[in-house]
Curated annotation (Swiss-Prot):
Name of the protein in question: Threonine--tRNA ligase
Molecular function via GO: ATP binding; metal ion binding; threonine-tRNA ligase activity; tRNA binding
Keywords: Aminoacyl-tRNA synthetase, ATP-binding, Cytoplasm, Ligase, Metal-binding, Nucleotide-binding, Protein biosynthesis, RNA-binding, tRNA-binding, Zinc
Record's subunit section: Homodimer.
The species this protein was found in: Pectobacterium carotovorum subsp. carotovorum (strain PC1)
Amino acid sequence: MPVITLPDGSQRHYDHAVSPLDVALDIGPGLAKACIAGRVNGELVDASDKIDTDAQLAIITAKDEAGLEIIRHSCAHLLGHAIKQLWPDTKMAIGPVIDNGFYYDVDIDRTLTQEDIELLEKRMHELADTDYDVIKKKVSWQEARDAFAARGETYKMAILDENISRDDRPGLYHHEEYIDMCRGPHVPNMRFCHHFKLQKTSGAYWRGDSKNKMLQRIYGTAWADKKQLASYLQRLEEAAKRDHRKIGKQLDLYHMQEEAPGMVFWHNDGWTIFRELEAFVRMKLKSYQYQEVKGPFMMDRVMWEKTGHWENYKEAMFTTSSENREYCIKPMNCPGHVQIFNQGLKSYRDLPLRMAEFGSCHRNEPSGSLHGLMRVRGFTQDDAHIFCTEEQVRDEVNSCIKMVYDMYSTFGFEKIVVKLSTRPEKRIGSDEMWDRAEADLAAALTENNIEFDYQPGEGAFYGPKIEFTLHDCLDRAWQCGTVQLDFSLPGRLNASYVGESNERQVPVMIHRAILGSMERFIGILTEEFAGFFPTWLAPVQVVIMNITDTQSDYVNELTRKLQEAGIRVKADLRNEKIGFKIREHTLRRVPYMLVCGDKEVEAGKVAVRTRRGKDLGSLDVSEVISKLQQEIRSRSLHQLEE
């Protein structure tokens, strides 16, 4: 009979099959009350599942990440329970866990309003407050299908027909009169599901296919306790204030419109930020000894067939035809860079060759996934490809890592999560090649004192990769940087160099992106700084204002001086009260406001005020220019006197 080994190494012997809940109760009533599920030999199981052989067991509670995920999954079932009570003819599709919550896709004969969502959430709370038990039953495939057929659940029947083997025994979870199907595990009792909030609805095609019916997707968040939920909702409220779409409109940075979905219309101030960011990256490229190149906007489909993109990626590619030839608008820059590498004979002495491009790329993203600057169809990659020998990989990766941290630190990002994705089951190349490649990436990270986690099997078929994920001031994760080894593409496109032994060899290619998409990174920065861009990035760095018309000439003279000093400055000579002007430019997040009255004109000075409302007093014009130039040149994140 089973011997259960607990995480601390202690063992418990039983003369009968036991469940995780039985073991938890054996340990103590407190643990039994907290038990959500179990992890048996590394696999999550329901609290009620029986263990009849020797096993390693960990009791899962709400304090565990897995426990919180189970709570969220069960809240999706709770949503299903509630919606079927309110609108019994609703057909349930899928209800998975997502970051911070869950959603459920439903087929309902009404457009859900905010009032409906509030009513649904109220019913969910009423049901959860009864603390009913969730009963799991394993049944035959046919029994499951019959159960859903009797309820008219056509989507559940389709899942059974298309995704579940006839030999399988699906798990049916009974929430009183409501039944849902899932692999599980789920909470044993609804007392764990009291802290949730329904958030929004959207449209979603069944199985993500636009040829299928559009369903309504209901999103929710769920947490282990009241405090966690309140904290998350507060972060959401702050995120809403920082929404780059809202700030972009307030600051007149860009717009988008229906005639060009997913394409950005940059306005002057937004384009100023873009160009400053581009200039910063270009400076770093020069420092790290990259060539800058420019590839064509589109190439013949034949090229994309050679690379494998047409076979694996064509749904995301825009195409056009001319003179009986089909062209693909590039979704990425790498094939073009290989073509540039292939021009002229290369020797091992020419390597490493570092090639960078601000590449204008297009991808046919689903319209429903488009989101401001964060998810677009037309974007600019700060892309680079390094062609090198196998022996040079480690040093080149090391240099890439230094460049990543060098650039991220400029923007104040301190929390960077790093993951190393290793060989997948289906891959090209020998085990020896993968051993060396993975070891080189790991060694480069270690040499830079960077902590990282392995993601086994998550590498591309053509090579391992490092991913860099930024965490912003709200602790949201943004995956931006990538260092990816590629043992496939150079060979596919006949790239070669002459080695030391005078034989042609295929170079290793390193794909390197740091900001990722320039558009997306500007969106991230807009939300990180809440529109209060550091002075070097701010579209307008200084506004000079007069109090009356008598100071107009002085303001114009100062404006010219600051322009000559390389400072982005505007004069505001409008016949408005100075308080009105200050408020307007404060709302526009202009870093510095210089006020000129008769006293300042007479003394040859300016009254300096920051957008945060700090009065820096009356300063000499030359001193202001010098300090501003230093702040801009150093790309400081802080303003004067901060």
